[in-house]
């Protein structure tokens, strides 16, 4: 009877464990693993990590034709997600440069979030990068002013300033500010650079990003 009960409990536990809910973005990470299995990631590439502004930049290599780029952006991700999946996002690669775009969704997920908390989340991810890649170039692209998230801009701008101050003190690190480049002559954000959702940018928007990013690309 005891043996039967033990087997029953073991089977029950196994079933419950197998049905355990996967963490958010688990499938995205599995997709990255599959890509890496199908094609070994090249060494000394530029690794893009972050949220949908990278995910939707599917033709990023066309904007930087002489560079080898690995795009590992996954839409909706927050800095907390980059930290959670840091091993999967960093360990398979041997890049010469990492460029990060993330943080917007942290505020969108929790509008009451303080800029300092987002900055701390970024510092955690930066530290994880440096533990594995102490000497490579690491760059952070500023959170953009998205018309659909106008109510969050004050917090994002504050976080941008703090992240810039942090990056300015770090070796082999740069803060890439795309804010002014996306404004018109009156200092207003160019809505024509955005898709209908007023959140994601158009190919022309990516052209603007490219011009700002080019001096930083290794």
Regions found by a protein language model. Give the residues of each.
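Oxyanion-hole/transition-state-stabilizing segment in secreted/luminal serine hydrolases
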Residues: 54-63, 68-70, 81-119, 139, ...
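Sec-dependent signal peptide cleavage junction
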Residues: 17-32, 37-43
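Structural recognition of the beta-strand scaffold that forms the well-ordered cores
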Residues: 46-49, 70-73, 97-102, 137-142, ...
